[in-house]
């Protein structure tokens, strides 16, 4: 079937890197909503949705997130991220390797993270709105 072939091709293409984490985010006035997908040898092994307090600035909050979240974890070979992350001055060690794909399998997994993020954002945002009423 088509889906099986697509999955197989993704595994083959993604397995060129041993470990990839896909990070997608969006912000509102006070919070950063993020989804992280964890791929190991081309296979999606975990997904985490997070709400991060927005500190001084978006780039500072994202930098602190990466430092704290990965403090006790092995860094992946690459992070697949939205293009705007590359524009931030994150001041992270050179061990953090960010890729912002425009096409191909890496773009597809970023799109998948963004779909998950939008779903998470809508649910969380609705919960927040209901709490305020």
Question: Which residues are covered by each model-predicted region?
Answer:
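Conserved catalytic/ligand-binding micro-motifs in nucleotide and anionic cofactor chemistry
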Residues: 2-133
């Amino acid at each position: 079937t088509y889906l099986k072939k697509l999955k197989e091709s993704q595994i083959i293409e993604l397995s060129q890197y041993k470990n990839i984490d896909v990070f997608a985010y969006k912000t509102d006035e006070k919070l950063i909503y993020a989804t992280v997908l964890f791929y190991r040898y081309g296979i999606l092994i975990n997904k985490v949705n997070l709400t991060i307090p927005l500190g001084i600035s978006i780039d500072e909050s994202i930098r602190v997130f990466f430092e704290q979240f990965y403090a006790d974890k092995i860094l992946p070979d690459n992070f697949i991220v939205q293009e705007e992350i590359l524009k931030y001055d994150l001041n992270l060690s050179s061990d953090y390797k960010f890729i912002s794909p425009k096409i191909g399998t890496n773009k597809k997994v970023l799109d998948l993270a963004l779909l998950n993020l939008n779903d998470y954002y809508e649910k969380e945002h609705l919960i927040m709105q209901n709490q305020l009423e």
